[in-house]
Amino acid sequence: MLLLIKLGFIGLAIETLIVIVVWAIVYRIYREVKVEEKISQLRQRIRDRAEDSGNESDGDAEELANLLPPDRIDQDNWV
């Protein structure tokens, strides 16, 4: 009986560790998706403003440059 209780606690501890790892991975992916959505919205807003007024105002380009990694900024079509 004591052995079953010990095995139960060990199983519970292992399950808890697995749940923590899985949720950490899910949260990391969720944050990446949210950043990509924000980048897409900023790009679209910059394109719309460029079409409407011919300029990029309100610091959207700077905010987008802060969100993008440096290797993606060097590309010609980052907006």
UniProtKB/Swiss-Prot annotation:
GO cellular component, one term: membrane
Membrane side Extracellular: residue ranges: 1-7
Membrane topology per record: Single-pass type I membrane protein
Record comment: activity regulation: Ion channel activity is inhibited by hexamethylene amiloride in vitro.
Chief site of localization: host cell
GO annotation, biological process: receptor catabolic process; symbiont-mediated suppression of host innate immune response; symbiont-mediated suppression of host type I interferon-mediated signaling pathway; symbiont-mediated-mediated suppression of host tetherin activity; viral release from host cell
Cell location: Host membrane
One GO MF term attached to the UniProt entry: monoatomic cation channel activity
InterPro entries linked to this entry: Vpu (IPR008187), Vpu_cyt_dom_sf (IPR009032)
Positions in the Cytoplasmic compartment: 29-79
Domain of life: Viruses
Cytoplasm as UniProt keyword: no
Keyword annotations of the record: AIDS, Apoptosis, Host membrane, Host-virus interaction, Inhibition of host innate immune response by virus, Inhibition of host tetherin by virus, Ion channel, Ion transport, Membrane, Phosphoprotein, Transmembrane, Transmembrane helix, Transport, Viral immunoevasion
Modifications after synthesis and translation: Phosphorylated by host CK2. This phosphorylation is necessary for interaction with human BTRC and degradation of CD4.
Modified residues (Phosphoserine): S53, S57
Record-annotated membrane-spanning stretches: 8-28
Region feature Disordered, mapped onto this chain: 48-79
Biased composition (Acidic residues): 53-63
Domain text: The N-terminus and transmembrane domains are required for self-oligomerization and proper virion budding, whereas the cytoplasmic domain is required for CD4 degradation. The cytoplasmic domain is composed of 2 amphipathic alpha helix that form a U-shape.
Family (UniProt): Belongs to the HIV-1 VPU protein family.
UniProt miscellaneous comment: HIV-1 lineages are divided in three main groups, M (for Major), O (for Outlier), and N (for New, or Non-M, Non-O). The vast majority of strains found worldwide belong to the group M. Group O seems to be endemic to and largely confined to Cameroon and neighboring countries in West Central Africa, where these viruses represent a small minority of HIV-1 strains. The group N is represented by a limited number of isolates from Cameroonian persons. The group M is further subdivided in 9 clades or subtypes (A to D, F to H, J and K).
Quaternary organization: Homopentamer. Interacts with host CD4 and BRTC; these interactions induce proteasomal degradation of CD4. Interacts with host BST2; this interaction leads to the degradation of host BST2. Interacts with host FBXW11. Interacts with host AP1M1; this interaction plays a role in the mistrafficking and subsequent degradation of host BST2. Interacts with host RANBP2; this interaction allows Vpu to down-regulate host BLM sumoylation.
Biological role: Enhances virion budding by targeting host CD4 and Tetherin/BST2 to proteasome degradation. Degradation of CD4 prevents any unwanted premature interactions between viral Env and its host receptor CD4 in the endoplasmic reticulum. Degradation of antiretroviral protein Tetherin/BST2 is important for virion budding, as BST2 tethers new viral particles to the host cell membrane. Mechanistically, Vpu bridges either CD4 or BST2 to BTRC, a substrate recognition subunit of the Skp1/Cullin/F-box protein E3 ubiquitin ligase, induces their ubiquitination and subsequent proteasomal degradation.
Protein name listed in UniProt: Protein Vpu
Biological classification of the source: Viruses, Riboviria, Pararnavirae, Artverviricota, Revtraviricetes
Gene: vpu
